[in-house]
Amino acid sequence: MLSSGQSESLNQPMRMVICCLLLSTGLLAAVPSPAEQNALPATERQVEEVVTRLTGIMTTTQQAQSDAARPDVRMTTCSVQLEGDKSKAIYLYQEQTMSNNLGAPYRQRLLRIAASADGRAVESAGFKFVEAKPLAGLCAKPAAERLIAPMALDGDPTCTVRLVQAGDKYMGTTPEGGCQSNVRGAARITNEITLYKEGMDTRDRGFDAQGNQVWGAKEEPYRFRRLTP
């Protein structure tokens, strides 16, 4: 019979052999190394980065304080789940309000953030809601309760912005000629976006059927700056 000390001394090598066998056969969970994590497709990383930069609360308060002609707008964006969707796209609910009237959003939409078909950019596709008012304040709810039913969406995307990484920022525009619209007297809308870590600049503009600008940024873009992560 082996003593307890002899048994322990034999068990130690045995443990090492068993551990090595488990590792070699894949029975122990493998943790991706930093190098493996960084090996993700560039567009996948970019989609996640665009989502991170869009999510949270941004305002134009600083701009409005320096120029009384500028509106003080709050933009709130949060992740949501589109029921039944199995794609790799990430969905965001976004609403805009005047900072002095937070309970009455004047713009609400769903954004679908995904890699472009050619894998060279990130696309942000915007959807209108059939009934938007009941969704006001959605971002204040727990993530598990932020569910959007497909039937809540009013058809296909109203517009898509293609975002391309340029250094430490993302830049994008609407398609040439803009997108059809019926928002506040505009027959079409255009937008130019620069997305930073600390916020974004946007030249969101609406034009009537004769090509006259009826609302939106003119000489200077709206400068949204992050209020919360």
UniProtKB/Swiss-Prot annotation:
GO molecular function, one term: lyase activity
Domain of life, per lineage: Bacteria
InterPro entries the UniProt entry points to: CpcT/CpeT, CpcT/CpeT_sf
Classification via Gene3D superfamilies: CpcT/CpeT domain
CDD domains linked to this entry: CpcT (cd16338)
Pfam families the UniProt entry points to: CpeT (PF06206)
Keyword list, A-Z: Lyase
Enzyme Commission numbers on file: 4.-.-.-
Entry's family note: Belongs to the CpcT/CpeT biliprotein lyase family.
Function: Covalently attaches a chromophore to Cys residue(s) of phycobiliproteins.
Protein name: Chromophore lyase CpcT/CpeT 1
Organism: Gloeobacter violaceus (strain ATCC 29082 / PCC 7421)
